[in-house]
């Protein structure tokens, strides 16, 4: 019996850099891929990573403040997710809350 293994690519969007991690449903242990500079070439690098990893799901962290409210960075992360979805690559984009506590 063949097992379906899902590959995940995760992005943590910051002001100057985007942290990138990779995981799969079999090993279930994420590991750091590296960082991408936030600049005019960021989406080219994201496209390269999508082609290399071929994830079934892209996970993007959505930061929240201590009260669980959205912040300016939340909007930046959501916009990044929209750009990933617009690349035309068949991948599900999911947002995951990152609440400061």
Describe the residue ranges of each PLM region.
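Phosphate- and other anionic-substrate recognition elements at nucleic-acid/protein interfaces
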Residues: 2-11, 15-101
